A protein has these predicted regions:
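Short glycine-centered segments of the SAM/dcSAM-binding site in methyltransferase folds
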Residues: 44, 136-137
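Class I SAM-dependent methyltransferase SAM/SAH-binding core
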Residues: 46, 50-96
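A short SAM/SAH-binding and catalytic strip from SAM-dependent methyltransferases
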Residues: 106-120
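A short glycine-rich, Lys/Arg-flanked "PGG" loop and its adjoining helix->strand segment in the class I
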Residues: 122-134
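Conserved class I S-adenosyl-L-methionine
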Residues: 1-40, 54, 58, 156
């Protein structure tokens, strides 16, 4: 989850339930994520909008070097308690990351882009590309426009909408804008990434894209 462009920290109130409720609901998606980008010992993995670190945990357990960045002090505090000193976790803006060029083998970002204002999403994705090795991969998970399958997709859509409303007005409006612009698939198309693998899950509500950078293309 992201805290990408909001100066306040509206996520503190969700901390007691985040790992207890939200993380388990994503357990199937996490297994798919690991199948798309299996951990390899020694690989450098960054999670942009790392939240409490749930997506990083299996990579750390497999012997990867794990890094995370988030703008929510409360989420990052929970992640630091979880990992101790075994992860390099930074409080910061995903549009201006404190990492060197071409450093990471894998850059993850789950449910991050939809939470940002539209004018910041391109800056964040360009930062992800900057810190990614030329032969590395981006693994993005976020909302998909469908078609939404009945009944599972409709139930999932209602649950997602409920969570978005809980996030507050700005959060909700950013998510609606993201979907109106084509969701994750619509967002990544102008960047001309190579789509190495793709999964649509959650009854059509969620897309996972494993991407590599087309070195011959220019960012939009």
């Amino acid at each position: 989850m992201i805290r990408g462009a909001m100066p306040k920290d509206p996520y503190w109130k969700f901390i007691p339930l985040y790992d207890l409720v939200i993380v388990p609901t994503n357990s199937i998606i996490k297994r798919i994520l690991l199948n798309l980008a299996p951990p390899v010992p020694g690989m450098k993995v960054l999670d942009v909008g790392c939240g409490t670190g749930a997506d990083l945990k299996p990579y750390g357990e497999a012997g990867c070097e794990i890094y995370g960045i988030d703008l929510s002090p409360s989420m990052l505090g929970r992640a630091r308690n979880k990992f101790g000193g075994s992860a390099d976790l930074r409080l910061g803006d995903a549009a201006h990351m404190p990492f060197q060029d071409r450093f990471f083998d894998l850059v993850l970002s789950s449910y991050t882009l939809h939470e940002m204002p539209n004018n910041r999403r391109s800056s964040v994705i360009n930062e992800m590309v900057r810190v990614l090795k030329n032969d590395g991969n981006l693994l993005l998970t976020d909302f998909h426009t469908g078609p939404i399958r009945f009944p599972a997709g409709w139930i999932g859509k209602a649950f997602i909408t409920f969570l978005e409303i809980l996030g507050g007005r700005e959060h909700l409006l950013n998510g609606l804008n993201f979907l109106a612009s084509g969701g994750l698939q619509g967002f990544i198309e102008p960047f001309r990434f190579n789509v190495d693998k793709k999964e649509i899950v959650g009854g059509g509500n969620i897309a996972l894209f494993l991407l590599s950078v087309n070195l011959g293309s220019n960012p939009p």
